[in-house]
């Protein structure tokens, strides 16, 4: 039997309060202070070895009432309404396969399964793999006309069991899994022409995906993009591999930096139903509208509306202008026709379009109207209803909060995630709005479990009859299944009760989510507070920063990470702050750093920390800052500001000069590095220009030598500037590690090294 105070501590472990937290009363009761609490802390080893594992429930919808879920290596088919299941594929199938299966994919008609193995990672999303097709009716692998090894991407058709795949940068289609492949494109060339897959910059910054293939709803057509990197400059770096390699390999990637030549883009649609073994496919090109074709441009969204209507969104290189082009198929000519009357322009006068790109449209079933998230007159992202043949739209949501995403659209309701509830930007809840009366809005998640759950995502069945709610915090993750007819909970899928039980025997930190005022505006922060936090004591503080455009660090998500260790074992407060430039609070805040990266977002981190140091429980002689990527840049700019607020800091894989970073990301916020545009802001925002001020702080600079994203060049130039300025600093590189420094040994090493540096800075050794 649990003692009452232990029960409450267990609740604290799963529900770090996401309100203004003072010292929880439970921690002040008899027998519950640091001197008498014999429970263990959450250690660095716990984080590195993932001792305490959160459970997830990753289902895959295969109809409007059924989903697949992998359990004990069996693939089970569940009925959503009743919860009963049957074995869809036995674990013995995997055991007999002879390869280590990385993933699987079931054809829409459930006749075949695609097994993925020999997975080889390339960049953030891209990889190559081998594939075999399993016939579910015959319960055997298909051995004829197999998919080639090192396939770059593969996808089932929307219906039936056709396959489209990319190999050696060209597209192939199989009408039947055991039929010969038909080649769709013939122009593919490594690192030059990409058909059906993205090049580096489109993968990283535009589509956040490797695939550039889109099946039509009934699989009559296959749309694809072609990227031409012929003129794109190459980034080159050494890859050292194992010590037996006498000369390092040289990795070369077409990588457009700010102001450099960009890839060009073409878009095609091919009629798959017209394919025959003796006739090569004819692809019809859809040319962008003239308003973007006149200069450099991007394809940023592809959405099939109906079987014979497709929506494309194009973006100018200066990303404050986008245009949606809705094209119809002309059966008489076999061409796709664009009409000015079906084009929709989106312009930003204060920054850039969308959060990172224009939002995707959600079309009604007849294809004659759509809903899309755009900025309203007040600068908040809300849902607007468009007719396809009219320019103006009607906003169906409003307020000083933002819609995060549209999740489902039926004939009666639109479902969306927003941060409206209680005015907390770092929360997420599911809402539905009645389409025949926009005043009828219901929050489906706000009051379900408000202490434990304030940050939700959702997964809908194919026609939105059922949905899975995924609660990510502030308590332990919780997965539940609901019927959309009445929105009642059908069952709990995973509640992490085992982890809850284990964490009751661990001294866990608590989480504070609150706001301060800067420049007359409310800005949010979070603090991970040590166990038995006592506001009358003084604690060292680590500011964990990202601070990139549209970022958010103060949120209601439960995490077990490095900060958990630092707070639990080392009694360090770990804080994060969302200042100017951060997202989900309106364009006024987000666009404040437009064309001036390295300014306000840096200043606000310093000023927020000054306010933290005045709260009475922060030791102002022991304040540090750390960040990764953009966070490494802001860390370095903060330390180089000479504010006197910070004693030390750690920058991992930082940007140091925006002219070194990729064109799509950088120019979105900074424009072009030319005298006619914004060269002065580029030159005034480098870390190197602040080298002299690093004499006042302790600095640890870390980078992976095979970082394809933020190149080692960035840290090399910081190092050179610091050496030239006579600054004593520490540095660590990780051989052949990319931007994530995620290999098992490197991951353990970097966090051990950073922990030692921080403890030394705070005199905790």
From Swiss-Prot:
Belongs to the peptidase S9B family. DPPIV subfamily. The chain crosses the membrane at residues 7-29. Cell surface glycoprotein receptor involved in the costimulatory signal essential for T-cell receptor (TCR)-mediated T-cell activation. Acts as a positive regulator of T-cell coactivation, by binding at least ADA, CAV1, IGF2R, and PTPRC. Its binding to CAV1 and CARD11 induces T-cell proliferation and NF-kappa-B activation in a T-cell receptor/CD3-dependent manner. Its interaction with ADA also regulates lymphocyte-epithelial cell adhesion. The gene is DPP4. Residues 1-6 are cytoplasmic. The soluble form (Dipeptidyl peptidase 4 soluble form also named SDPP) derives from the membrane form (Dipeptidyl peptidase 4 membrane form also named MDPP) by proteolytic processing. N- and O-Glycosylated. It is found in: Cell membrane; Apical cell membrane; Cell projection, Invadopodium membrane; Cell projection, Lamellipodium membrane. Keywords: Aminopeptidase, Cell adhesion, Cell junction, Cell membrane, Cell projection, Disulfide bond, Glycoprotein, Hydrolase, Membrane, Protease, Receptor, Secreted, Serine protease, Signal-anchor, Transmembrane, Transmembrane helix. Disulfide bonds join 384-393, 443-446, 453-471, 648-761. One of its GO terms (molecular function) is dipeptidyl-peptidase activity. Glycans are attached at residues 84, 91, 149, 218, 228, 271, 280, 320, 392, 495, 684. The active site is at 629 (charge relay system), 707 (charge relay system), 739 (charge relay system). One of its GO terms (biological process) is endothelial cell migration. Monomer. Homodimer. Heterodimer with Seprase (FAP). Requires homodimerization for optimal dipeptidyl peptidase activity and T-cell costimulation. Found in a membrane raft complex, at least composed of BCL10, CARD11, DPP4 and IKBKB. Associates with collagen. Interacts with PTPRC; the interaction is enhanced in an interleukin-12-dependent manner in activated lymphocytes. Interacts (via extracellular domain) with ADA; does not inhibit its dipeptidyl peptidase activity. Interacts with CAV1 (via the N-terminus); the interaction is direct. GO terms for cellular component: anchoring junction; apical plasma membrane; cell surface; endocytic vesicle; extracellular region; lamellipodium; lamellipodium membrane; membrane raft. Its main location: membrane. This is Dipeptidyl peptidase 4. Residues 30-765 are extracellular. It is a single-pass type II membrane protein. It catalyses: Release of an N-terminal dipeptide, Xaa-Yaa-|-Zaa-, from a polypeptide, preferentially when Yaa is Pro, provided Zaa is neither Pro nor hydroxyproline. Inhibited by GPC3 and diprotin A. It holds the Pfam family DPPIV_rep.
């Amino acid at each position: 039997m649990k003692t009452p105070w232990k029960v409450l501590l267990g609740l604290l472990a799963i529900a770090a309060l996401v309100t203004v937290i003072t010292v929880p009363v439970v921690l002040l009761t008899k027998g519950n202070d640091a001197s008498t609490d014999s429970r263990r802390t959450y250690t660095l080893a716990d984080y590195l070895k993932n001792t305490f594992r959160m459970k997830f429930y990753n289902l895959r919808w295969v109809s409007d009432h059924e989903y697949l879920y992998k359990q004990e290596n069996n693939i089970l088919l569940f009925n959503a309404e009743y919860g009963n299941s049957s074995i869809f594929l036995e674990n013995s199938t995997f055991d007999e396969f002879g390869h280590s299966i990385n993933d699987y994919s079931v054809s829409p008609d459930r006749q075949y399964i695609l097994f993925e193995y020999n997975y080889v990672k390339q960049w953030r999303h891209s990889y190559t793999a081998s594939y075999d097709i399993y016939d579910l009716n015959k319960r055997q692998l298909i051995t004829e006309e197999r998919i080639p090894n090192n396939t770059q991407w593969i996808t089932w058709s929307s219906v039936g069991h056709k396959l489209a795949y990319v190999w050696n940068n060209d597209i192939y289609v199989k009408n039947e899994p055991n039929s010969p492949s038909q080649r769709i494109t013939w122009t593919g060339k490594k690192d030059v022409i990409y058909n059906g897959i993205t090049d580096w910059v489109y993968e990283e910054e535009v589509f956040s995906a490797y695939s550039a293939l889109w099946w039509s709803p009934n699989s009559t057509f296959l749309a694809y993009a072609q990227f031409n990197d012929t003129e794109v400059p190459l980034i080159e770096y050494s890859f050292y591999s194992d010590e037996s390699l006498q000369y390092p390999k040289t990795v070369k990637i077409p990588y457009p930096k700010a102001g450099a030549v960009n890839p060009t883009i073409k878009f095609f649609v091919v009629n798959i139903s017209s394919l025959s073994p003796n006739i090569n496919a004819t692809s019809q090109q859809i040319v962008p509208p003239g308003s973007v074709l006149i200069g450099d441009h991007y394809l940023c969204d592809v959405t099939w509306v109906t079987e014979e209507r497709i929506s494309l969104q194009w973006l100018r290189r200066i990303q404050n202008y986008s245009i949606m082009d809705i094209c119809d198929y002309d059966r008489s000519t076999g061409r796709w026709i664009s009409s000015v009357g079906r084009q929709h322009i989106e312009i930003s006068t204060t920054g850039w379009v969308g959060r990172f790109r224009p939002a995707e449209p959600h079309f009604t079933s007849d294809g004659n109207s759509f809903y899309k998230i755009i900025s309203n007159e007040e600068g908040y992202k809300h849902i607007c209803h468009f007719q396809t043949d009219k320019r103006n739209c009607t906003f169906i949501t409003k307020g000083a909060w933002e819609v995060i995403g549209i999740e489902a659209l039926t004939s009666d309701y639109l479902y969306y995630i927003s941060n409206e509830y209680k005015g907390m930007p770092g929360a997420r809840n599911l809402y539905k709005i009645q389409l025949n009366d926009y005043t009828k809005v219901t929050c489906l998640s706000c009051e379900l479990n408000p202490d434990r759950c304030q940050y939700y995502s959702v997964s809908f069945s194919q026609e939105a009859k059922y949905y899975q709610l995924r609660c990510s915090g502030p308590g332990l993750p919780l997965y539940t299944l609901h019927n959309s007819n009445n929105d009642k909970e059908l069952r709990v899928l995973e509640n992490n009760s085992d982890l809850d039980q284990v964490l009751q025997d661990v001294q866990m930190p608590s989480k504070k989510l609150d706001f301060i005022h800067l420049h007359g505006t409310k800005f949010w922060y979070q603090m991970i507070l040590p166990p038995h936090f006592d506001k009358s004591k003084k604690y060292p503080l680590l500011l964990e920063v990202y601070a990139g455009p549209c970022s958010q660090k103060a949120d209601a998500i439960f995490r077990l990470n490095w900060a958990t260790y630092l707070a639990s074992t080392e009694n360090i407060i770990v804080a994060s702050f969302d200042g100017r430039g951060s997202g989900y609070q309106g364009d006024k805040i987000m666009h404040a750093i437009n064309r001036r990266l390295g300014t306000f977002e840096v200043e606000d981190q310093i000023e927020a920390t000054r306010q933290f140091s005045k709260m009475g429980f922060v030791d102002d002689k022991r304040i540090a800052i750390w960040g990764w990527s953009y966070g490494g840049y802001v860390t370095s700019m903060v330390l180089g500001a000479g504010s006197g607020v910070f004693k030390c800091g750690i920058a991992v894989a930082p940007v140091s000069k925006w002219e070194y970073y990729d064109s799509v990301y950088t120019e979105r916020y900074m424009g072009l590095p030319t005298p006619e545009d914004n060269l002065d802001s580029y030159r005034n925002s480098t870390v190197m220009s602040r080298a002299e001020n690093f004499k006042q702080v302790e600095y640890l600079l870390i980078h992976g030598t095979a970082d394809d994203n933020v190149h080692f060049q960035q840290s090399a130039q910081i190092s050179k500037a610091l050496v030239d300025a006579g600054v004593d600093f520490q540095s660590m590189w990780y051989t052949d590690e990319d931007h994530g420094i995620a290999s098992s040994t490197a991951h353990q090493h970097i966090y051990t090294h950073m922990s030692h540096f921080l403890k030394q800075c705070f005199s905790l050794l």
